């Protein structure tokens, strides 16, 4: 069985690549990214700077792939505004998900966000919620949505002063009774949970399986995997 990852150069995605490549559940791990990924055994990476071509790369490189992970995302500041954010964070993710569905992927894992809700008054959370709902509507045999809180770890690019403050606070409260104020979790922990859940046997039921994993369950799973 093989896996495919987009967002493999980000905080969570880089850890996903590492964990998936080290897992005995996957024979090959495919990626498509705008810059090269760390070379590892089992990893077959395609560098394509034009993200509009990613869906075709996915269709052409998904033979034997049963699991797809998306940790791809951006911020409104990096995107250069609301409309570009939609095109990148929502648009690229959704087009890649459609390509994965067409390629016969069985399990789709989306790293989303705490508070994602299409009815939210906050643009970021509203967009994340719409992405979740639209991917669910594609009806993969199994869809897993992971909604982490404050993501801890080293980023290749600063996400702004607000994010830096939130991350510092998350580091302070992680493992304390005050963790509920940020629900901090490392990129590596998210990756381990994602690979663990995606590796569970897929049972054929009456219809598509949708599993949403919030902060409390994430915390429990992280502890169980230690």
Swiss-Prot record:
It holds the Pfam family NAD_binding_10. The keyword Phosphoprotein does not apply. One of its GO terms (biological process) is import into nucleus. It is a peripheral membrane protein. Its main location: mitochondrion. Keywords: Membrane, Mitochondrion, Mitochondrion outer membrane, Transit peptide. One of its GO terms (cellular component) is mitochondrial outer membrane. SUPFAM superfamilies: NAD(P)-binding Rossmann-fold domains. This is Protein FMP52, mitochondrial. It comes from Debaryomyces hansenii (strain ATCC 36239 / CBS 767 / BCRC 21394 / JCM 1990 / NBRC 0083 / IGC 2968).
